[in-house]
């Protein structure tokens, strides 16, 4: 029996980018089922860093696409973020320093996806441009596999970064070693030891620190990392420059649906 393979996309107010992400997946030969976890809602960002208070309207993902299932969380049907934060105020801490990854919504969404997709999944964000088939990441010996973004625009730390680029979670392997949730608050970077013959990875990076410290079977060869830029930073956020958004759209223009146009015949000789 073939192993179940699922692509999970976390969607937030950017339907045109989610569509482009799905089309880029299909473009590179992946016919795996796609699950879109729709967190779209109206949100007001407070003033700060030289920007006024601003409100982003809700833009849920409504497009019908073959092989795509949408999990509607626009009204908190799956995860009621406000209620969860009230119950666990110290567990979920916002991390909006780098493109919003690590926010409470992302953290709780990934935890929910672990419940909904118990056989493992590849997690991508809506503003990712796939340039090759990600099937190489789907390997049962890995507990975690990821592509790394190297000094891409939007990464103010100037270091390689995994999430939320493109990563594979082997949920059964995680669970076998007592890992039942993913916490970006303690799982930010993964640095491979260049001179270490044991293929060692920096703690305090990918996976939980205590997993790396106390679950040695999840370390080393059971983690795979492949350097590759698969993300054009900044394009998915309404508060970034129009130039950045235009660059993203230009890079993805062949993936967007275009309205049918009536061809006109020019009677003049060419």
Identify the residue ranges that each predicted region occupies.
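Catalytic core and acceptor-binding pocket of nucleotide-sugar-dependent glycosyltransferases
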Residues: 175-248
């Amino acid at each position: 029996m073939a192993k179940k393979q699922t692509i999970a996309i976390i969607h937030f107010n950017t339907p045109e980018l989610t569509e482009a992400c799905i089309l880029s997946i299909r473009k590179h030969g992946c016919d795996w089922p796609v699950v879109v976890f729709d967190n779209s809602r109206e949100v007001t960002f407070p003033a700060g860093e030289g920007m006024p208070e601003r409100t982003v309207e809700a833009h849920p993902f409504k497009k019908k696409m073959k092989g795509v299932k949408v999990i509607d969380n626009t009204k908190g049907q799956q995860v009621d973020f406000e209620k969860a934060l009230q119950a666990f105020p110290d567990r979920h801490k916002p991390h909006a320093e780098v493109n919003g990854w690590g926010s409470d919504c992302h953290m709780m969404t990934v935890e929910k996806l672990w419940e909904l997709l118990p056989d493992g999944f590849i997690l991508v964000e809506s503003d990712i441009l796939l340039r090759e088939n990600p099937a190489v990441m789907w390997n049962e010996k890995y507990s975690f596999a990821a592509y790394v973004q190297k000094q891409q625009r939007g990464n103010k730390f100037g270091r390689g970064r995994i999430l939320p680029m493109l990563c594979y979670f082997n949920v059964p392997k995680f669970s076998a070693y007592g890992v039942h949730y993913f916490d970006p608050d303690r799982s930010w970077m993964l640095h491979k030891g260049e001179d270490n013959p044991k293929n060692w990875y920096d703690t305090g990076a990918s996976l939980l620190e205590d997993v790396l410290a106390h679950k040695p079977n999840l370390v080393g060869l059971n983690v795979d990392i492949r350097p590759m830029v698969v993300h054009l930073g900044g394009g998915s956020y309404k508060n970034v420059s129009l130039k950045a958004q235009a660059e993203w759209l230009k890079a993805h223009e062949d993936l967007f649906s275009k309205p049918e146009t009536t061809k006109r015949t020019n009677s003049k000789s060419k």
